Regions:
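Glycine-rich phosphate/diphosphate-binding loop of Rossmann-like nucleotide-binding domains
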Residues: 74, 81-99, 157, 161, ...
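Solvent-exposed alpha-helices and their adjacent loops that cap or buttress functional pockets
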Residues: 12, 55-60, 96-97, 122-124, ...
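Rossmann-like adenosine-cofactor binding region
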Residues: 232-311, 316-318
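Adenosine-phosphate binding glycine-rich loop
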Residues: 158, 291-388
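Flexible, glycine/charged-enriched surface loops at secondary-structure junctions
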Residues: 133, 181-185, 213, 362-369
C-alpha cells in the first residue's frame, strides 16, 4: 500500500482525525438546565471555594495538551505550526486509543522561548498534563525545564523521554540476548538533538559507563570550540577519556567512522543512510544497531544483518523491533494522571523502561520490544509512574 497517498486521501475525507463528543445527554429542558444554566453554576461555586475540585467536576483530570511550534516535525524539520498540526492530531488519537486520555492538539505561531512558556502557562488550568512535541533543540530543553518547575501539572517532552525510555527498554533486552553487561558495553549515539541527549542521560543513569556522541561535525569532546551549552555539558559525561588525557587512544576525536569502531551498540537518531556496512563490521562482535531515523533509518536492517549485526531495531512498523514512542507516552500520562503525579522523575523513567523490557518474557533478536497493540503494555508503563 502507498501509505502517503492513502494518508492524504483519508485526512481529506475526514477533515482531520479528531472531533469533540459530548459525554452527557442533551435531549430536553431538564438536561439543558442541569448541564448548563442554571445548574452549571453549582460546580463553578464549588471550584471557586476549592480549586482542587476542578479535577472532580471537569475534564481536567483526564485531559492533556499536545503542544508544538512545528520546528522539528518527524524527519521534515521546521515546517511551521499549521503543517505540524496533522502530527499533533495523530498524537491525540494515540492517547485516546491506547490510554483513554483526552488530548487536544495545540500549535503555536511563535519560536520565542519566553512566548511559548508564557502561552502554555496561561492555558495550563484547562489541562491535567502537558505533552511537548516536535520542538527543536536546544530550545526544547529550557522550555521543558522551566515548565516543570513553574507548573503544578506533569510536563514531558516526548521526543526526549519517550524515545529514551523505549530505547533503554530495547537495550535491556538486547544485553540479555548478547550476554553483555551494562557496565562493560561501549555505546555510540549518533545525533545530539533532543532524543540523543535524553537517551544518553538515561543510559548513564541506568549504569552504562562508556558513551560517545557524534553530531554532524564529529565526536563531542572538550577540544571543540563550536559547542552550544548543552553539548558543552555533554563533554563532562561522554567520551570521558578526553577529560583525563586528550592524547589518549581512548579519547575519540573524528567522525562517525572513527567513533563506531569497537563499539557494542549503535544508537542513531540522526539522518538516513549514514551508517555503512563497513562501519558495522568495525564494531565489536554481535553488535546491536538501533537505527531510529524516520522514515529512512541510518542503515536498512537487511544491510545491517549482512554486516554482522546481532540485533537491529528501527522506528518503522514494517520491520521487527519497532522503537516507537507510542509504547511509552500513553502509559506515562495514564500513570501520571491516575496517581496525581506532579513531576515525572528519572526514577520513574528508569522503572518504565525496565517494566517495558520485562513485558517481553522471552526476548529474542527479532523481538526485544512489545507491540503497542499487545494488551497490558500501557498499564505496565503506567505502573511505573507513581509517587513514593
Amino acid at each position: 500500500m502507498d501509505f502517503y497517498t492513502e494518508s492524504l486521501k483519508k485526512h481529506k475525507k475526514y477533515s482531520g482525525k479528531l472531533e469533540t463528543v459530548s459525554k452527557v445527554p442533551l435531549e430536553n429542558r431538564d438536561d439543558l438546565s442541569t448541564y448548563y444554566s442554571p445548574g452549571v453554576a453549582e460546580p463553578c461555586r464549588e471550584i471557586a471555594k476549592d480549586k482542587s475540585k476542578v479535577y472532580d467536576y471537569t475534564l481536567k483530570a483526564n485531559t492533556i495538551a499536545v503542544i508544538s511550534d512545528g520546528t522539528a516535525v518527524l524527519g521534515l524539520g521546521d515546517i511551521g505550526p499549521e503543517a505540524g498540526l496533522p502530527v499533533m492530531e495523530g498524537k491525540c488519537v494515540l492517547f485516546k486509543r491506547f490510554a483513554g486520555i483526552n488530548a487536544f492538539p495545540i500549535v503555536l505561531n511563535t519560536k520565542n522561548v519566553e512566548e511559548i512558556i508564557a502561552t502554555i502557562k496561561h492555558i495550563a488550568p484547562t489541562f491535567g498534563g502537558i505533552n511537548l512535541e516536535d520542538i527543536s533543540a536546544p530550545r526544547c530543553f529550557e522550555i521543558e525545564e522551566r515548565l516543570k518547575s513553574e507548573l503544578d501539572i506533569p510536563v514531558m517532552h516526548d521526543d526526549q523521554h519517550g524515545t529514551a525510555i523505549v530505547c533503554l527498554a530495547g537495550i535491556i533486552n538486547g544485553l540479555k540476548i548478547t550476554n553483555k553487561k551494562k557496565e562493560d558495553v561501549k555505546i555510540i549515539v549518533n545525533g545530539v538533538g533532543a532524543a540523543g541527549v535524553a537517551i544518553t542521560k538515561l543510559l548513564l543513569l541506568y549504569g552504562i559507563k562508556d558513551i560517545i556522541m557524534v553530531d554532524s561535525v564529529g565526536t563531542i569532546h572538550p577540544g571543540r570550540k563550536d559547542l552550544n551549552p548543552v553539548k558543552e555539558m555533554l563533554t563532562n559525561i561522554t567520551n570521558t577519556a578526553c577529560l583525563l588525557n586528550p592524547n589518549s587512544s581512548e579519547c575519540i576525536i573524528g567522525g562517525l567512522a572513527e567513533a563506531v569502531k569497537g563499539r557494542d551498540i549503535f544508537i542513531g537518531v540522526s539522518a538516513p543512510g549514514v551508517l555503512t556496512q563497513d562501519m558495522v563490521r568495525s564494531m565489536n562482535k554481535d553488535p546491536m544497531i538501533f537505527a531510529m531515523a524516520n522514515p529512512t533509518p541510518e542503515i536498512m536492517p537487511e544491510l545491517a544483518y549482512e554486516a554482522g549485526a546481532k540485533i537491529v531495531a528501527t522506528g518503522r512498523s514494517d520491520y521487527p523491533n519497532q522503537l516507537n514512542n507510542v509504547l511509552v507516552f500513553p502509559g506515562i500520562f495514564k500513570g501520571a494522571l491516575k496517581n496525581k503525579v506532579r513531576m515525572i522523575t528519572d526514577d520513574m523513567k528508569l522503572k518504565a523502561a525496565e517494566n517495558l523490557a520485562n513485558f517481553v518474557k522471552n526476548p529474542i533478536p527479532e523481538k526485544i520490544i512489545p507491540s503497542p497493540f499487545e494488551p497490558g503494555v500501557v498499564d505496565c508503563v503506567a505502573s511505573a509512574i507513581r509517587n513514593g
